Amino acid sequence: MSLFALFYMLFAYLLGSVSSAILICRIAGLPDPRQNGSHNPGATNVLRIGNRKSALAVLIFDMLKGMIPVWAGYYLGLTQFELGMVALGACLGHIFPIFFQFKGGKGVATAFGAIAPISWAVAGSMFGTWIFVFLVSGYSSLSAVISALLVPFYVWWFKPEFTFPVALVCCLLIYRHHDNIQRLWRGQEDKVWAKFKKK
């Protein structure tokens, strides 16, 4: 990687470190997502403890954190491998944010945003997988884990030059969901629409 690419990856990390869930909850007067619900600062938990508008705002912002640096990297002349590492940097920032004691979200929305400029076919396959599993199961976490397991194969098929960095991103996503995997195994994971059934 070039020196510029390393600094640009650092920029992507810093951008990823801006936790939209925490900031939007503060602005909207909602509880701290790190201390309520699933204790995860992400769109799903904001939906759980707050409302749809706030959750949608978090989702869009988190996707843009991954999409903007990778998209801009194309126009800055970064190589394909460097673009993949920039995507990794944005996801690392979201998962381990320097501005919030390195305790961040799961990284799914940021990973989707980062992968979209790399390959719309991969992003579409990832989104389709997530939606299918979610509609069948109702579990956001299970949808994310299965998507993360399959995305490296999608990348290998459509854009093989990005397989290594994207596989690293997917390993991060699976690692970040280890608590969810245990709850799924024990049958203790909440379905997303459980909140609306209680109303």
UniProtKB/Swiss-Prot annotation:
Chemical reaction(s) catalysed: an acyl phosphate + sn-glycerol 3-phosphate = a 1-acyl-sn-glycero-3-phosphate + phosphate
Subcellular location: Cell inner membrane
Gene Ontology terms describing biological process: phospholipid biosynthetic process
Keywords on record: Cell inner membrane, Cell membrane, Lipid biosynthesis, Lipid metabolism, Membrane, Phospholipid biosynthesis, Phospholipid metabolism, Transferase, Transmembrane, Transmembrane helix
Xref: InterPro entries: G3P_acylTferase_PlsY
Top-level taxon in the UniProt lineage: Bacteria
Membrane topology label: Multi-pass membrane protein
Pfam families reported for this sequence: G3P_acyltransf (PF02660)
GO cellular component terms attached to this protein's record: plasma membrane
Record pathway: Lipid metabolism; phospholipid metabolism
Top EC category: transferase
EC number: 2.3.1.275
Parts of the chain that traverse the membrane: 4-24, 56-76, 80-100, 115-135, 154-176
GO molecular function: acyl-phosphate glycerol-3-phosphate acyltransferase activity
Sequence similarity: Belongs to the PlsY family.
HAMAP family documented for this protein: PlsY
Function recorded in the entry: Catalyzes the transfer of an acyl group from acyl-phosphate (acyl-PO(4)) to glycerol-3-phosphate (G3P) to form lysophosphatidic acid (LPA). This enzyme utilizes acyl-phosphate as fatty acyl donor, but not acyl-CoA or acyl-ACP.
Subunit structure: Probably interacts with PlsX.
Protein's name in the database: Glycerol-3-phosphate acyltransferase
Naturally occurring in which organism (per UniProt): Haemophilus influenzae (strain PittEE)
Organism lineage string: Bacteria, Pseudomonadati, Pseudomonadota, Gammaproteobacteria, Pasteurellales
